[in-house]
């Protein structure tokens, strides 16, 4: 079995290269990364209509070519709340939506969440589809939070490769865990995490939410994403969403301290491709020394 490759591209963008099938969640690329990337995905999954998750410039580049088959989106990417610029503020724009302005309509399919965040106040029912059989892949949907209105749900995705028995859960901008997520328990290998349950220094303590969702789902591995650093090599340019984390090590260790006994936290660096040894699904950690000088400046005293 060939090894797999994973990459967090910054913000909530994440891709999975399995050789026989490749897919991406919420691609959001800039500069050389956007210019240089070739359409290599069979499927792309979009959690919601906010600009940093449903990014027209990136999707225009990726949703084409012989390999590409379908862009799966939540309803708001096609029928956003109106008027867009008023309802979404700086989170979405009339220039961008519906996404069929930028991607051929026949290449776009709307999905609805199978597992809902309802607490009894909305009593919603959607007509679906909620699941997909894509040959080698099976897809289930969850509600992922930041709904603009109750009838415009957002989507997280559990994507499972049947033969390789490897699965990825992308939760979108989910803020609160909810009981229906228990249905995913022990189905998830890699949990791609974004906002939920993060407690910054001297901020509101939200860690119980993080502990709760990990207990509900019980993933094997947990990958923190949706933050930026001040690295020159960070794939999201300075001045773009999301905000910087001031101390990445402290950020990761606080997460590890909260949930480390329940799952293994994988501290991915944005923009770096990580190889998975298959079928063990084990990350091969690679690093080397890299001199930041050509002529040592200390020679001059």
Which stretches of residues belong to each language-model region?
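Structural recognition of the beta-strand scaffold that forms the well-ordered cores
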Residues: 24-26, 45, 72-73, 169-171, ...
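Metallo-beta-lactamase
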Residues: 160-211, 216, 225-233
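Binuclear metal-ion centers of metallo-dependent hydrolases, dominated by the metallo-beta-lactamase
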Residues: 7, 83-134, 181-182, 210-301
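Active-site environment of divalent metal-dependent phosphoester hydrolases
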Residues: 31-33, 50-54, 78-82, 128-130, ...
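Core dinuclear metal-dependent hydrolase active-site scaffold
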Residues: 1-39, 43, 110-186, 270-301
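Short amphipathic alpha-helical segments and helix-helix/interface helices
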Residues: 13, 56-63, 156, 180-182, ...
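Active-site metal-binding motif and surrounding structural segment of the metallo-beta-lactamase
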Residues: 29-80, 185-192
């Amino acid at each position: 079995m060939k090894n797999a490759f994973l990459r967090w591209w910054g913000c909530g963008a994440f891709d999975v290269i399995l050789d026989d099938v490749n897919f991406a969640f919420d691609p959001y690329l800039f500069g050389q990364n956007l210019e240089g990337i070739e359409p290599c995905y069979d499927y792309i999954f979009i959690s919601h209509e906010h600009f940093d998750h449903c990014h027209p410039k990136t999707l225009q580049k990726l949703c084409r070519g012989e390999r590409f088959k379908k862009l799966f989106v939540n309803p708001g990417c096609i029928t956003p709340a109106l008027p867009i610029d008023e309802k979404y503020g700086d989170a979405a724009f009339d220039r961008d939506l519906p996404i069929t302005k930028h991607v051929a309509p026949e290449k776009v399919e709307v999905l609805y969440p199978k597992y809902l965040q309802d607490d009894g106040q909305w009593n919603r029912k959607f007509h679906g589809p909620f699941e997909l059989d894509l040959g080698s892949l099976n897809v289930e949907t969850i509600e992922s939070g930041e709904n603009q209105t109750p009838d415009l749900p957002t989507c997280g995705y559990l994507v499972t490769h049947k033969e390789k028995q490897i699965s990825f859960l992308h939760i979108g901008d989910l803020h609160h865990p909810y009981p229906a997520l228990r249905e995913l328990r022990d189905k998830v290998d890699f949990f791609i995490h974004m906002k939920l349950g993060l407690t910054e220094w001297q901020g509101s303590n939200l860690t119980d939410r993080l502990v709760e969702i990990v207990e509900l789902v019980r993933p094997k591995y947990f990958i923190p994403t949706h933050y930026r650093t001040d690295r020159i090599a960070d794939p999201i340019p300075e001045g773009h969403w999301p905000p910087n984390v001031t101390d990445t090590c402290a950020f990761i260790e606080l997460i590890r301290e909260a949930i480390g006994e329940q799952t293994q936290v994988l501290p991915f660096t944005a923009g770096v491709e990580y190889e998975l040894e298959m079928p063990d699904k084990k990350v091969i950690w690679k690093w080397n020394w890299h001199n930041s000088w050509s002529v040592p400046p200390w020679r001059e005293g």
